[in-house]
Amino acid sequence: MSTTLWSCNDTPDYNDAYDNTTATTAVAQKLVAGTGLIGHMIDDRTWTVTDGVEATEIAYVSYEGYTTKMFVVEVDLSNPAISIAASLPDNGTTFKMQSMTRQALAADAAGNKVWAGFNADFFNMTTGVPRGPVHRNGVMLKNTFDSGERSVFYITRDKKAAVAHRDDYPAVNASGVIQEAVGGGVMLMTEGELVTQEEEGLEPRTAVGVSEDGKTVWFLVVDGRNWSYSNGMRYQELGLCFQSIGAHDAINLDGGGSTTFLVRTTPEFTDDRFKVCNWPCDNGGQERAVGDGLLIISNQ
């Protein structure tokens, strides 16, 4: 009787089996090339939300082995029909809490058509008062910050986007240039450079970045707290993503169970015209009521 002995390959192709960084969309290709995060691309696709607004959905496994689902929304403010506005519950001026879908429905109207929406600032979960400033339609509703590392995202009266650290906000506010504004958390990028922050681990994230000329805005939404679906992102990783896609400055917004990204699915004014694209983690996929938000609007 003869015996045949088998052994494992001396040079197993573990990396070859794992690595798959082939991306089909321009945004995902930039993230693959610039972040070093993506080990295995599961899927990526880009679609046009409306003229001047492109959304990309990306699913991947990181080199650390974490599944990740993220959305990148690019807004072209040089398009004369497109604008970004701060939102409050019931399209009003009173601070309270309401889901982003309800905020979008309240603001949506002919000539002020909402195409996408995102949660924005951290807020008092009892009163709904945002932690940072709020400006709507050129009117300052709140100009103070709670303690801690805070920032602000704003749109100027000549329709340019910018972000500022809390220390720089008083001068910006005094200049009278702000048309829309919401508060945010830590700075992720400033003047093209990453800002080092004390890490808080992998979490669901909402964040916003702007180009140097203020005419392009990127929203990043990352789901988390669901091991098999998406684990979230760290601050440094968010910054790398913004840097890779071309942002000059970026800030973190409220995340966790507040993280929400919705889009309009039809130009008609049907009751179900808005769809939440991400997976809000605290309520099994159901939206959390939040203090304020940011809406992408067209005047057509």
Predicted regions and their residues:
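C-terminal motif of bacterial Sec signal peptides marking the signal peptidase cleavage site
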Residues: 3-7
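Zymogen propeptides
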Residues: 9-145
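Conserved beta-alpha junction segments in alpha/beta enzyme cores
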Residues: 59-62, 68, 72, 183-214
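Short beta-strand scaffold segments in enzyme catalytic cores
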Residues: 71-74, 121, 151-155, 187, ...
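Short, solvent-exposed aromatic-acidic interface loops
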Residues: 87-94, 167-171, 222-226
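Active-site-adjacent helix-turn-beta-strand microarchitecture at beta-sheet edges
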Residues: 119-200
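Conserved, well-ordered active-site substructure
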Residues: 127-146, 197-212, 216-248, 258-300
